[in-house]
From Swiss-Prot:
Peptide with both antimicrobial and neurotoxin activities. This toxin acts both on ERG potassium channels and sodium channels. It potently and reversibly inhibits human Kv11.1/KCNH2/ERG1 (IC(50)=34 nM), rat Kv11.1/KCNH2/ERG1 and Kv11.3/KCNH7/ERG3 voltage-gated potassium channels in a similar potency. It acts as a gating-modifier toxin that shifts the voltage-dependence of ERG activation in the positive direction and suppresses its current amplitudes elicited by strong depolarizing pulses. Keywords: Antibiotic, Antimicrobial, Disulfide bond, Ion channel impairing toxin, Nematocyst, Neurotoxin, Potassium channel impairing toxin, Secreted, Toxin, Voltage-gated potassium channel impairing toxin, Voltage-gated sodium channel impairing toxin. This is Kappa-actitoxin-Ael2a. InterPro entries: BDS_K_chnl_tox, Myo_ane_neurotoxin_sf. It comes from Anthopleura elegantissima. The keyword Secreted applies. Transmembrane segments: none annotated. Disulfide bonds join C4-C37, C6-C30, C20-C38. Belongs to the sea anemone type 3 (BDS) potassium channel toxin family. GO terms for biological process: defense response to bacterium. It is found in: Secreted; Nematocyst. The keyword Electron transport does not apply. One of its GO terms (cellular component) is nematocyst.
Amino acid sequence: GTTCYCGKTIGIYWFGTKTCPSNRGYTGSCGYFLGICCYPVD
């Protein structure tokens, strides 16, 4: 996936969704251009 930043935290950018995939163990997220940025990077 594409990397993105929530402040200084690196995450993975998911296009076209407002929620992170629940089976990947993400602990946080932030809104991002036309999608969401989910972290930590898996």
